Amino acid sequence: DEHQKSASLSPEKLKNWGGYKGEIIEYDMQCSTLDSYISKNNITSIDLMKIDVEMHEPEALKGFKKHLDLFKPIMMIEVLTQDIANQLKPLLPNDTYRIIHLSGPRNSKLIKDFIIDYDHYNFLVYHKDNDEKILELIDNFADFNPFN
């Protein structure tokens, strides 16, 4: 398809995943870890974050290690493969972090490990200290269904 577009920090991953057939144009770019960005900009808290970095989620979390347990953000993480899920497990141990598989309206459920079902790739991940906050959010939106 001439309109097929994607972006990746790893051209090899792009070529080997999902049958991408488009042209690959490479650009040099500077990258930084979240930890260094947070320190450099004197950021004192992060409540909510979305991590969707096309199979570089483990690297993103490794670069956030210093502040992850300090800020304890609620995170929406896209996990595209079981290999990526396996790499995330030691970074988000289930004795400290909760995982909710976002599998459609009224189907989301708390799970012990990332499960890739190839229909739903998004997970809500939060520190166990945020249990009460998550329950309150669920109560507030119990009757909200964006698909009606």
Predicted ranges, named:
Residues 1-148:
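Phosphate/nucleotide-binding beta-alpha loop and adjacent structural elements of enzyme active sites
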